[in-house]
Amino acid sequence: MISPAMLLAAENPVLVYFQRVFMPDPFQGIYQVNTFDLLILAPYFLVLVVLAFYGSHRYLLLYKFYRNRASRPLPPVEALNPLPRVTVQLPVYNERYVVERLIEEACGIDYPRELLEIQVLDDSTDDTVALARNCVERFARLGHPIRYLHRDNREGYKAGALAEGLQSATGEFIAIFDADFLPPTDFLEKTMPHFSDPGVGMVQTRWSYINRGYSVLTQVQAILLDGHFVFEHGARSRSGCFFNFNGTAGIWRRQAIEDAGGWQHDTLTEDTDLSYRAQLCGWKFLYLPDVECLSELPVEMNAFKTQQARWAKGLIQTGRKLLPAIWRSPVPWRIKLEAFFHLTANLCYPLMSVLAALILPAIIVRFYQGWFQMLYIDLPLMIAATGSVSTFYLGSQRELFPGDWRNKLRFLPFILATGIGLTITNTCAVLEGLFGHQSEFVRTPKYRIEDRVAGSRTRFFQNVYRRRTHWVALVEILIGSYFTFAVYHALGNENYATGMFLCLFVIGYLGTGLYSLFQARWDRLAGLVAGQIAALRRPFSKSLQES
């Protein structure tokens, strides 16, 4: 009689076939793990696990968003009565192309003039000073309650300008708009009623984009920011977690600013810094996803990278400054944990840089260990680390554009590649933030670029605020070339799935580097061509007018 133990010990022909067909090990008896391989694989898997940890957090945000979907801010039952006095602050610095548009839109805000004050806080050092002053004087003559305040220094940068303006502000509530924003006429009508709750310290509205369709770069930026506003702000605000004022398109209760210690300029994200300090003081924040404020996206790759680096460094600085106080505070652990994820999320950029350095040797080592191990270990970690990006950002498009979101699918590879392409710039920024390196607040130049508006592209070609190409672009091109070799190696070994995945690194690094390096030359050439075409058209236009 055959015992059960003997049956268990016998070879199962099905398992033998499965192992032979689906788990081949052609290097059995040839390949052995050595110390060098362990030195490659240990940090490789550690980085993948941490990235998967942060990637999985996006799914947690999605869960919070949909679980608390019913808890959207409702219109207040009682309006503010009497209406309070409001100050609108417009901080600008060298904004010759957009400052007049900003002032015109701010003066169009619908609110009793006797209760409204508009401050133009100008730190400019170029002809923006004359443009802004003349524009303010013109609207003041028309009866608008607007004042022009100019500083001869940039002490504290934007935070310093806001703090100095606050000293002379007369409003109980402070609305703030950056130079690249177009305040809607009904902004105060839609936001002020929410302050009928005396515990509300700040109301943030959602950004929308006047030049969303200008280029692939602006489309990608819009989708990335949509993900932030729809799911990050939506999930955090609905679940009662801390979230941040975005520096513009929002309105503060003055008392909340003062209780939190006012504007401080020891971080590059003074808005997030003040937001967390105010919420630690007990003030409630509201996010209104249905109230939009138009803005202008950067159209230049170098400007976009500078903006992203400033945000990455600023959040790390804010985390260093405030996370100890957040952990010690009496707020619930779920709020502390969400604040940790928010303020440390940019640590993923240095980890991505390490992964970029290790991925080719790790793939070679894993190939000799057998591809099935890559299938059930590496692939799930890769999906956890990066797959949530697709769900997160495409989900935001489905929320905002339910009838048109599928058209956004074509931008998904560019979204993934852009995130990869930013790793070098943002890694440098994050390391500076971690080690306390202070740097200047570098503003993002704006050019009054609007979709389908005549002269927008010519204005960009001829602008004086173009960002210079940084040495990082050359590093990105070198790394992109390295990944081109990695793709060649993967395809040569019939590792097609890995090769396709590595193509994202090629597109990300090479695309970002080449676009940063040559955009100025391409646009200069395009500007010359546009100028020549305009010169050729001029005589014909003149003759048509005379006839």
Where are these regions (language model features)?
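Acidic donor-binding/catalytic loop of UDP-sugar-dependent glycosyltransferases
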Residues: 100, 127, 177-194
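Cell-envelope/extracellular polymer assembly enzymes that use nucleotide-activated donors
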Residues: 84-87, 117, 258, 273
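Long helical/loop segments within the catalytic core of UDP-sugar-dependent glycosyltransferases
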Residues: 136-173, 185-268, 279-280, 301-344
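Acidic donor-binding segment of Leloir-type glycosyltransferases
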Residues: 104-150, 154
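Membrane-embedded multi-pass helical conduit in multi-pass membrane proteins
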Residues: 65-67, 77-80, 345-440, 470-538
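Loop-to-transmembrane boundary segments
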Residues: 97-98, 328-351, 449-484
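N-terminal signal-anchor transmembrane helix
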Residues: 60-115
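Catalytic donor-sugar/metal-binding loop of nucleotide-sugar-dependent glycosyltransferases
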Residues: 266, 275-293
